[in-house]
Amino acid sequence: MRHFIRSAAVAIAMATASTFTLSAAIAADLSGAGSTFIYPVFAKWADTYKKDTGVGLNYQSIGSGGGIKQVIAKTVTFGATDKPMSDADLEKNGLVQFPMVMGGIVPIVNLTGVKPGELVLDGKTLAQIYLGAITTWDDAAIKALNPSLTLPSTAIAVVHRSDGSGTTFNFTNYLVKLSPDWKDKVGSDTAVEWPTGVGAKGSEGVANTVKQTDGGIGYVEYAYAKQNNLSYSKMLNAAGKVVEPSLESFGAAASNADFKGAKNFNVIITNEPGDTTWPIAASTWVLIHKAPDDAAATGEALKFFAWAYKDGKETAKALDYVSIPDSVVDLIKASWKADIQAGGKPVYAGE
């Protein structure tokens, strides 16, 4: 996404690193870093929030791993990650986490003559492609899923993330659930030892590399596929149904997320049941310090998140993200008041 935001003091163009800056005449602009998955909606929210409140926001779309490192190092007010931190790591680093949005990860392909949503894949076949066991697009396993589609003999060019990525975590978490070979040989994390393929930095890098590579395949958050006019695949889900990526299919997966019953809101939503469920769904969590050094900046950040939960729903919907239910938002705000404090008082003063 190409987007320029200007103010009297700064004119920054978003490029490969996808850093957007909204400048405001306040002592402490909001600052965050991490997930590329949430970046498209963060960018839109930031635009509107600037117009509504005059408060600036700087968010670096550098991947979940980078966001975790920066918030721990206190170089930003908040981090964003698509892989929730463990209870032990949250406690060790004095952090709290809460979900911001949910959405879908889609396989993207560059196949001449194949339109978005025409190709069908499943988890086992996707794992075999990323293991390097399936190497051409006319392989019998792919043809079996696409009997009415004429597939070329083009070599498959695998593209994966080169940076620490929550998108990679959820993608590989899904493959682990569908492929014993993948589980044994590769596993799931924000960064893995890829058996084959080339790495690209960020979702932007994956999207651009696939777009430029004949026979390419990669994985990105759905908004990147739409915004870059990339061909994406349908998927065979846990119920054995072929489904398209959409707000509805992501919502079906999200409906299984029991955030209320999960400590630290730690819920993974890959390969969930249901006829209409998209199988590679994911959430993004915000990470923020319990006892922040800059209470004012943290308070402003929490105001922004509260605004996004309430007034950012339509923007999220337009980009095919699923909003966090109001009942869960109430729990999140209660956790802010209980857990994020300075001088013995809650940093968040909202409702």
Curated annotation (Swiss-Prot):
Grouped into one coarse class, the protein's main location is periplasm
Where is this protein localized, as stated in its record? Periplasm
Where is it found, in Gene Ontology cellular component terms?
ATP-binding cassette (ABC) transporter complex; periplasmic space
- Organism phylogeny: Bacteria, Pseudomonadati, Pseudomonadota, Alphaproteobacteria, Hyphomicrobiales
Q: Name one GO molecular function term.
A: phosphate ion binding
Q: Which family does it belong to?
A: Belongs to the PstS family.
What does the function comment of this entry state? Part of the ABC transporter complex PstSACB involved in phosphate import.
The molecule here is called Phosphate-binding protein PstS
SUPFAM superfamilies attached to this UniProt entry: Periplasmic binding protein-like II
Where phosphate binds, per the record, is at S35, T36, F37, S64, D82, S165, G166, T167
Task: Name the keywords, alphabetized.
Answer: Periplasm, Phosphate transport, Signal, Transport
Superkingdom, taxonomy of origin: Bacteria
One matching Pfam family, short form?
PBP_like_2
Q: Does the keyword Transport apply?
A: yes
A Gene Ontology biological process annotation? Answer: phosphate ion transmembrane transport
According to the record, the signal peptide region is 1-27
Quote the subunit structure annotation. The complex is composed of two ATP-binding proteins (PstB), two transmembrane proteins (PstC and PstA) and a solute-binding protein (PstS).
Q: What gene makes this protein?
A: pstS
